Structures are given as structure tokens and as C-alpha cells.
């Protein structure tokens, strides 16, 4: 319907005449005369009154019911500055109140009078859209707190004053929820409140004490009546208490402790959304209980971790609202309809709930204050922010004009011509704040109802575009197969139907029994576990996606129990189920990794926090550069309390597990060759060793101080890595072969601690502490198994030796096998000068003259001893590590070459890893380049196979038919070295 603006003015003039006819006669004549003469937009006092009367029946009725207010307006029309300092103006009125009947009257008349002023300012565009809803909120807060304080004094006189254990008087705290909490109250809105008090106890000062709970419940009931009860003067605010814990079935007022327990254990999604805007009304910053209550509620709303339930819960709420809109026929509802106010609120709440725990700028209730913060974080574009802001203000302007007409809570567009005309006039031109909080006038091409609808629909379309992009459309209908799996979880299909599904997935019939048994066990487990509604919804969403992917995989018999075990472990940790629902690529990634690695499946099941690592495929396939492990680890530990040893120890384990997953994923998916895998695993271990030593040093020095002979900043301590750590060849399950050395000073004592001990005892305590940190079995598992048997004198030797004692032992007492071990050693931790000293000792020992025949005899004897001890009896299989032609033979060959040729060429002692040992041997013409290349290739191939067997959780054993060529070549080289002593040239 269209109508010209001249017709609108005529209609409103006629309406004004009808409404003014009820005014006292002395006002009627002057207004009628003004209507007859003033044809332009009203500018005079009477003209403004006439216009405001025409725009709002409520304004006219308030003038009629309160003649003294009409007289005030006649003398001077309301201004925006008259709509302030509500508490200061209400307090003297309440001071004169003697009973509850008078209280009801004063509150209602004050509320209507002040609302009428705001209606006037809104109609005449004397304040911005924000000015109006902020003042509406301030008015409500002042009235609520004024009523509470008056009733509190009466209640204390009657029932005594509630106090805590220290005898301090307690007050009733009121949480304003929804738009009241966000200073965004509608013109005619319900107010959502929650009542709480600091602690239990009893009242004092009355003839008969009652407990605090009863006192505050009665006070709350009286306050609700004072606000909500309808009298001849109307009501103050429709009061809704259903947002309190347990809703209508819960206590009207709860203590802080009871409220905290509820939100920790039973708080639901919609309560988190509601609590975003929760604000303590009348809060006094000097009141310690105010801060306590705020701190109590914040963790419930703003989680420290990213909560992926938010998106799905918002979708569910959206669909629920859409069903309500359809059911109630609310097609033209500017709040609940598509692109309406609620969708803008949802958009902002999504980011508050997902990011608010980490971004404090998002932890505020006012939507228009949060919106630019979201844009500043680049979560939405500047254009999207502006679209949402403009739409919100237009919709809120429309909503408040609608509600001010009859003081009715409505968001439904009017069907009658009169109210449509009012909206047209009110939305053509109005003021609002810009992004710099400065007043701006906005003008829309609105001249009739049709053009109003066009503008409205454009705003709604802008909102819906952002909303759909963020929240996402409703998921597509499940396929028939997915529906069947969904029904299986709900116990709605029989075993025969499961068999039919397996046939459709091309599963071998011989596997049916095993698969169905595992599925039934899983379903029975789900049935008896208390996973809650949210968890059950997430499970029914993830399983129909998970199971078809498992059965599409060739390794489904191995994969099914691994994946079911992971799901079983996260059944009661709904956030992780929802992570897999919201991130299908993460689920697919997990399936692929678990298919190829039992180790990963077990780790993820034991530590579900690792699922977070699957979210970023890019990061997953790109482990940090070698030199970044140390900085990444330190950055990771910064979020922990440095003095909390237990927390730091767990943090080290969690970092290792997460990083190990990234390395394994890159390995499985082909992003890392075997040599790089070992490099990454080794540098990861080194970074952890550095932090462990620092942590142990901190603990030991706190108690004993530091050795007096050390210069400032020195530790005088070396960690030597042997074996695979020393050779930069760590595998996924490798332990750490370590030797600890220290800078000696026989007479030195520690100083600066609680107790002084000898320096050698200090380093022994340090070594023990390091081993303890590595080996202690926490919930997060063991950090690394540590093997100290390669220290001087082995298990009978000191746990930590001085550098000088180590040198003497290696030069004069070490066995040949210990010198072999020294080949694969290198300094991992310690001051540069000490590492240089160790390198010199190592080079001196390895290049010392030795009898070649004795060396050959010792090496062969040690290898024979290992064969006998680690013999693999199964002739049908090959142990890659210990059998002839395997890894151990290659390692012995490398060690022998160094010990045999370093006396003539000390440069051959430079490297500790087998690959570079072979390379330097070829460069020095000890072996040919061809043999070097073949040895390296054999070694890499064998290690690669071991890596992948480790990932599968299997032993390093393969069928006898594998690696026959490699084994034959290695045995040939062994034979030439130790039985013919040739020049090893081809």
C-alpha cells in the first residue's frame, strides 16, 4: 500500500484531534488552533506536542492520566537532557513513600512519565537511536534498584538483616539479562532478571531470625510484585525470571556458591548466550562481592579453549526460531524473521563465545561496542560491520517506534494504515551515532509503505548474507546410508539390517561377525554412558559420516576398533565430538592417520587434546624448522605457571605429543622423507632436554644454591647424547641414551641455597632430578625413557662424572664397545667451551692408535654376543634391527671404519651419524663412492620401514622375503671387512 506524505500529515492531524479531545478544555482550543494554522513540520512547543501525540497513543494517554505532566510539557516540551539522572530524581520520591501501595503508585507514574518523555524525544528525533535505548535501560535499572532498596529496608525491619559469617550485611544482587544487561532495552520490553546473594547465613536484629535464602526469596517476590503487578496505574515492567538456574523450578534467589556449581555442572548452551549480556544492576565498584560475582560467571560464558559447540548450537537455535516463526505465522517479524535483530545478535554472539575467552575486548554486553572489535580482529570485513550496524540501528528504530505506539511488546510489522504511516515518518530521517561515536543523520528514500519495505528488505538481505556465511545453511539431508547409521545409533535397526549396510559398503562376508560384534559393543557402551543431550546430538551427527569412511578404507578391520576407541574416549567430552562434526576435513585426516598408525590412534585416544592439531592441515604437514623447536616449546610453556613443576612437566609432555603427531602426519602423508623425520624427532628431543635441564636446575638450585666455582650464568654441566640421539637418528619410540658430565672442582661447595653441599653431590642431585622429570609417569604419560648405561663403568658407575674423570676413563679403561658407542655421541646441552672440551676428548679417544686385529676381533665378538642375546628364532621373518644384514650391522660397520681409520686421519671423527660417516669415508677414499651410496640407501630404506612399523604399533619384523638384496649387500661388506680385510673397493 502506498500513500503520499500529505495524506500522512492529514491522518496524524485527525488522530491528534481525537486524542486531544480527552484533554482538559484549557489545552484543547490552543492545540486545535495550532493544527489549523501550522501546516509545516512542527517546530513550536504546541506543534511538537501535537506531533508526538499523533505518533504515540501511549504518549497521549500518559498526558491525559497525569495532568501535571501535561502542564509541564505545555510550558516546556521534554528535551533529551531531561531524560537523565533517573536515580537522583526517583530517590526523593521514594523517600516520601510509607507503604507498598504508595510504592506501586510512585514507581508506575514515574515510569510512565519518563517513558512518555522518551517517546516524545524519539518521535521528534531529539536523540539518536542509541540514546533512546540506553536511556530506556538506565530508567529500568534505576527503577529496579530504587524499588529493591526501598523493599530491602522494609524487609530488614521485619525479618532482620541478612549477614555473612563475619556479620557483614548482605544485599540482593540483581543480574539484568538480555537487552537490559546490554543497555539496549526496547521501548516496551520484558525485563529478564536473576537474583543472587553472596553467602548463606541468617538474619540478625529481628525477634526471630530466618536463613538468608528465605529472606532473599521473600524480598525477590516482593520486588517482582512491585514491578510486574498490574494496578489502576498500570505496571512498571513485565518481569521474567525464567533465565535463573533451573528455570521456573529453581529457587528464586541463589547464593553465589550454588550459582557457580550450577553453571559449572549443568549450564546449558542457551544460558551461555543469555549470560553474555548479564550485568549486575546498580553495581558498586567498591563492593568486593560485585567483582566476585563477575569472576564467577566469566569462565562459564567465555571458555579458555575454542568451543566448537557454538556454531551447531546457534544453528539449532536458529532452526528452532524459524519453526516458531512458521508455526505462529510471524512472517513480518523484524526480530525473529530472516535478517532480523536476532540474527545480528547471533552473529556477534558467535564470536564472543568462540573467541571471547582469548579476546577480552569481546567480553562486553553491548552489541554495538562489540561489533567494531570483531571487525578489528578481522573476523568480519569492514563492509560487513557497517552493513550489520546500519541494519541493527534501522531495525531497532523501527522496533522502538512500533512499541511506543501503544506501549506494547511487539516486533510484528503493522497491517493497519495508521501505524504504517507512523513508521514511514519515523524512518525517513533520524539520528544515530557513527563509528566514531559522533551524531550523524541518516536519510532513507522512504516516502510510502512500499519504499519502507524495500529499505527494510535490503537491510534484512545484508544481515542474512553475513549470517549464512558465518553460521552456515542447514546441512543437506542425510543420504539413505547415513540415515541407516543414524538409526543404528538410536537402536532402531536390527543386526540383519547392519549386514545389509555392510554389503552395500562391499565388506567381505567373512568379516561381518567381527565388525557387528565391535559395533554392538560400542552401541551398548554409548547406551550406558551419561553423555548428555548435547553429546548425543553430536554423536549422531559424526557417526553417520565416520562409519562409511571407515568401510571405504581397505584397512577397515584395523581402522574400525581404532576409531571406535577414540570416539569412546571422547563420548563425555562433547567439545571434541563437535570438533569432528564442525570440521569434516579433520575427521577425514584423523581416519587417514589412524589407518596408517596405531601409535597415533592410541595417542589421540589417550590425549584427545591432540585433535586440535588436525584443524590446520597446513600446519600439520609442515612441522617447525629445526631451529624453531626450542622457541616454540618456550612459547608453549609461557602460558603455564613457571613455579608449578607439575604443570610444567605435563606441559612438556603435551607439547611432545602434539609435535610428534605433526611429524608423524607429515611422514605418513609423504611430506617428510625418513632422514628428515629423524632430524625432526631429534631436534624435538634436544629442545625438550634443554628445558628439562633448566627446570631441574631451577629446582635443585632453589634448595642447594649453585657451585661456588662457577662464573655468573654458568652451569658447568654437559648432557651427552649417545645412540640414536647422538646420531641424529631418533625414531618414534626411541629412548634417550644420555651421559651427564660436569666441570670439576674437588673442593667446591654450593652457596646461595637453603643448604650447602659439595659440588659433586650437587651435580648428582641435578642428574637425578633430570631423570625424574623425564621418567615420572603422569596422566600425560612418560616424557622419554632414559638409558644411562653408557656412562663410565655402566650401571655400576656414577650417575654424573666430572669431565676429567670421563676423559681418563675413555683413554685408559673403556672397552672397545664403549669406544664404538662414543662414535655415535655428541654434546646436546652445555656451555660452548665445555662442548668444545668434550669434542676434543672424543676426537682424541677415537683417533688414538689401536691394534687393527684386536679391534676387528672385539667388534666381531660384540656383534656375535648381540646375535646370541637378541637371536630371532623365526626363520620366516626378518628382524630389521638385530638380524644379520640389518640396521645393527650397518651401525657396526660405520663404527669400525671410524675406529680403524681415525688414527691415520683424525678428521674422520667429525660426525656422529651413520650417513655422514659413510660420506666422509668416501671423501677420504676409505670406501668407494658406490659402496657409500649403497650403504646409505640400505640404511635409509631399513629405517624408513622401522618408522612406519612403529607408527602401526608393530615390531620391527617383516617377512623373510623383504630386503633380500639389501641384506645380501650388507653381509658382503661385513665379510670383506672382518674376514678378508680388503681395501673394500669395487
Curated annotation (Swiss-Prot):
Its cofactor is Mg(2+). Its EC number is 2.7.7.89, 2.7.7.42. SUPFAM superfamilies: Nucleotidyltransferase, Nucleotidyltransferase substrate binding subunit/domain. Keywords: ATP-binding, Magnesium, Multifunctional enzyme, Nucleotide-binding, Nucleotidyltransferase, Transferase. Residues 1-475 are annotated as: Adenylyl removase. One of its GO terms (biological process) is regulation of glutamine family amino acid metabolic process. One of its GO terms (cellular component) is cytosol. Gene3D superfamilies: 1.20.120.1510, Beta Polymerase, domain 2, Glutamine synthase adenylyltransferase GlnE, Nucleotidyltransferases domain 2. One of its GO terms (molecular function) is [glutamine synthetase]-adenylyl-L-tyrosine phosphorylase activity. Residues 481-986 are annotated as: Adenylyl transferase. Signal peptide: none annotated. It comes from the Bacteria. It catalyses: [glutamine synthetase]-O(4)-(5'-adenylyl)-L-tyrosine + phosphate = [glutamine synthetase]-L-tyrosine + ADP; [glutamine synthetase]-L-tyrosine + ATP = [glutamine synthetase]-O(4)-(5'-adenylyl)-L-tyrosine + diphosphate. NCBIfam families: PRK11072.1 (NF008292). Belongs to the GlnE family. PANTHER family: BIFUNCTIONAL GLUTAMINE SYNTHETASE ADENYLYLTRANSFERASE_ADENYLYL-REMOVING ENZYME, GLUTAMINE SYNTHETASE ADENYLYLTRANSFERASE. Involved in the regulation of glutamine synthetase GlnA, a key enzyme in the process to assimilate ammonia. When cellular nitrogen levels are high, the C-terminal adenylyl transferase (AT) inactivates GlnA by covalent transfer of an adenylyl group from ATP to specific tyrosine residue of GlnA, thus reducing its activity. Conversely, when nitrogen levels are low, the N-terminal adenylyl removase (AR) activates GlnA by removing the adenylyl group by phosphorolysis, increasing its activity. This is Bifunctional glutamine synthetase adenylyltransferase/adenylyl-removing enzyme. It comes from Pasteurella multocida (strain Pm70). The gene is glnE.
Amino acid at each position: 500500500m502506498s500513500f503520499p506524505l500529505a495524506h500522512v500529515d492529514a491522518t496524524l492531524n485527525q488522530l491528534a484531534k481525537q486524542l486531544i479531545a480527552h484533554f482538559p478544555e484549557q489545552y484543547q482550543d490552543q492545540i486545535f488552533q495550532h493544527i489549523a494554522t501550522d501546516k509545516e513540520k512542527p517546530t513550536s512547543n504546541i506543534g511538537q506536542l501535537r506531533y508526538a501525540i499523533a505518533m504515540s497513543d501511549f504518549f497521549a494517554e500518559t498526558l491525559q492520566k497525569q495532568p501535571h505532566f501535561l502542564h509541564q510539557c505545555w510550558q516546556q516540551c521534554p528535551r533529551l537532557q531531561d531524560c537523565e539522572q533517573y536515580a537522583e530524581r526517583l530517590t526523593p520520591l521514594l523517600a516520601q513513600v510509607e507503604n507498598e501501595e504508595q510504592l506501586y503508585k510512585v514507581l508506575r507514574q514515574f515510569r510512565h512519565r519518563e517513558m512518555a518523555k522518551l517517546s516524545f524525544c524519539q518521535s521528534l528525533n531529539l536523540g539518536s537511536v542509541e540514546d533512546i535505548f540506553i536511556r530506556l535501560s538506565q530508567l529500568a535499572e534505576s527503577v529496579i534498584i530504587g524499588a529493591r532498596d526501598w523493599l530491602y529496608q522494609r524487609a530488614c525491619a521485619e525479618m532482620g538483616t541478612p549477614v555473612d559469617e563475619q556479620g557483614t550485611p548482605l544485599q540482593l544482587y540483581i543480574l539484568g539479562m538480555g537487552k537490559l544487561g546490554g543497555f539496549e532495552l526496547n521501548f516496551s520490553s520484558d525485563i529478564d532478571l536473576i537474583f543472587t546473594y553472596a553467602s548463606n547465613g541468617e538474619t540478625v536484629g529481628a525477634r526471630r531470625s530466618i536463613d538468608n535464602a528465605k529472606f532473599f526469596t521473600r524480598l525477590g517476590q516482593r520486588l517482582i510484585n512491585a514491578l510486574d503487578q498490574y494496578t489502576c496505574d498500570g505496571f512498571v515492567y513485565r518481569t521474567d525470571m525464567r533465565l535463573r538456574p533451573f528455570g521456573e523450578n529453581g529457587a528464586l534467589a541463589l547464593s553465589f556458591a550454588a550459582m557457580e556449581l550450577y553453571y559449572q555442572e549443568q549450564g546449558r548452551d542457551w544460558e551461555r548466550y543469555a549470560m553474555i549480556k548479564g550485568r549486575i544492576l546498580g553495581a558498586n565498584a567498591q563492593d568486593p562481592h560485585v567483582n566476585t560475582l563477575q569472576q564467577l560467571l566469566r569462565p562459564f560464558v567465555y571458555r579458555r579453549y575454542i568451543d566448537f559447540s557454538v556454531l551447531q548450537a546457534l544453528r539449532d537455535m536458529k532452526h528452532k526460531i524459524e519453526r516458531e516463526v512458521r508455526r505462529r505465522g510471524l512472517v513480518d517479524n523484524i526480530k525473529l524473521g530472516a535478517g532480523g535483530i536476532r540474527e545480528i545478535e547471533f552473529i556477534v554472539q558467535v564470536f564472543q563465545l568462540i573467541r571471547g575467552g582469548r579476546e577480552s575486548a569481546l567480553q562486553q554486553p553491548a552489541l554495538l561496542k562489540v561489533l567494531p572489535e570483531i571487525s578489528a580482529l578481522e573476523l568480519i570485513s569492514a563492509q560487513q560491520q557497517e552493513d550489520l550496524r546500519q541494519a541493527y540501528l534501522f531495525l531497532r528504530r523501527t522496533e522502538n517506534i512500533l512499541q511506543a505506539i501503544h506501549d506494547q511488546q511487539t516486533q510484528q510489522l503493522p497491517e493497519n494504515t495508521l501505524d504504517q504511516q507512523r513508521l514511514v515518518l519515523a524512518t525517513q530521517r533520524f539520528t544515530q551515532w557513527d563509528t566514531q561515536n559522533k551524531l550523524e543523520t541518516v536519510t532513507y528514500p522512504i516516502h510510502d509503505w512500499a519504499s519502507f519495505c524495500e529499505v527494510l528488505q535490503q537491510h534484512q538481505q545484508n544481515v542474512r548474507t553475513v549470517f549464512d556465511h558465518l553460521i552456515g545453511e542447514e546441512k543437506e539431508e542425510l543420504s539413505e546410508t547415513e540415515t541407516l547409521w543414524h538409526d543404528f545409533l538410536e537402536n532402531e535397526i536390527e543386526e540383519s539390517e547392519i549386514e545389509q549396510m555392510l554389503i552395500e559398503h562391499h565388506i567381505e562376508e567373512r568379516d561381518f561377525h567381527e565388525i557387528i560384534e565391535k559395533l554392538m559393543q560400542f552401541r551398548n557402551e554409548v547406551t550406558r554412558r551419561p553423555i548428555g543431550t548435547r553429546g548425543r546430538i553430536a554423536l549422531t551427527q559424526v557417526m553417520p559420516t565416520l562409519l562409511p569412511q571407515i568401510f571405504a578404507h581397505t584397512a577397515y578391520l584395523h581402522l574400525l576398533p581404532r576409531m571406535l576407541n577414540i570416539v569412546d574416549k571422547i563420548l563425555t567430552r562433547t567439545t571434541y565430538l563437535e570438533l569432528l562434526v564442525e570440521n569434516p576435513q579433520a575427521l577425514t585426516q584423523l581416519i587417514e592417520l589412524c589407518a596408517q598408525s596405531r601409535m597415533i590412534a592410541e595417542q589421540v585416544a589417550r590425549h584427545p587434546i591432540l585433535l586440535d592439531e588436525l584443524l590446520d592441515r597446513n600446519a600439520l604437514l609442515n612441522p617447525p624448522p629445526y631451529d624453531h623447536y626450542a622457541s616454540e616449546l618456550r612459547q608453549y610453556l609461557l602460558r603455564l605457571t613457571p613455579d608449578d613443576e607439575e604443570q610444567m612437566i605435563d606441559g612438556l609432555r603435551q607439547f611432545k605429543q602434539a609435535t610428534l603427531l605433526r611429524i608423524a602426519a607429515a611422514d605418513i602423508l609423504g611430506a617428510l622423507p625418513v632422514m628428515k623425520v629423524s632430524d625432526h624427532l631429534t631436534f624435538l628431543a634436544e629442545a625438550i632436554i634443554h628445558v628439562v635441564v633448566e627446570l631441574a636446575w631451577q629446582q635443585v638450585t632453589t634448595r642447594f644454591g649453585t657451585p661456588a666455582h662457577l662464573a655468573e650464568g654458568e652451569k658447568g654441566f654437559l648432557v651427552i647424547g649417545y645412540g640414536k640421539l647422538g646420531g641424529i637418528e631418533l625414531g618414534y619410540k626411541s629412548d634417550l641414551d644420555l651421559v651427564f658430565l660436569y666441570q670439576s672442582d674437588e673442593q667446591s661447595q654450593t652457596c646461595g641455597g637453603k643448604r650447602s653441599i659439595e659440588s659433586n653431590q650437587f651435580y648428582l642431585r641435578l642428574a637425578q632430578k633430570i631423570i625424574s622429570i623425564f621418567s615420572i609417569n603422569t596422566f600425560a604419560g612418560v616424557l622419554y625413557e632414559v638409558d644411562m648405561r653408557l656412562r663410565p663403568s655402566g650401571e655400576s658407575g656414577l650417575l654424573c662424572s666430572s669431565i676429567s674423570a670421563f676423559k681418563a676413563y675413555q683413554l685408559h679403561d673403556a672397552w672397545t664397545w664403549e669406544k664404538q658407542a662414543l662414535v655415535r655421541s655428541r654434546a646436546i646441552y652445555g656451555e660452548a667451551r665445555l662442548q668444545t672440551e668434550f669434542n676434543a676428548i672424543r676426537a682424541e679417544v677415537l683417533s688414538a692408535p689401536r691394534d687393527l686385529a684386536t679391534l676387528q676381533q672385539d667388534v666381531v665378538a660384540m656383534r656375535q654376543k648381540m646375535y646370541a642375546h637378541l637371536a630371532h628364532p623365526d626363520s620366516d621373518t626378518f628382524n630389521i634391527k638385530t638380524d644379520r644384514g640389518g640396521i645393527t650391522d650397518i651401525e657396526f660397520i660405520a663404527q669400525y671404519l671410524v675406529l680403524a681409520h681415525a688414527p691415520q686421519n683424525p678428521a674422520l671423527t667429525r660426525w656422529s651419524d651413520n650417513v655422514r660417516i659413510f660420506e666422509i669415508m668416501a671423501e677420504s677414499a676409505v670406501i668407494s663412492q658406490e659402496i657409500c651410496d649403497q650403504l646409505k640407501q640400505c640404511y635409509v630404506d631399513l629405517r624408513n620401514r622401522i618408522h612406519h612399523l612403529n607408527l602401526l604399533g608393530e615390531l620391527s619384523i617383516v617377512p623373510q622375503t623383504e630386503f633380500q638384496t639389501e641384506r645380501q649387500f650388507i653381509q658382503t661388506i661385513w665379510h670383506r671387512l672382518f674376514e678378508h680385510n680388503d681395501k673394500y673397493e669395487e
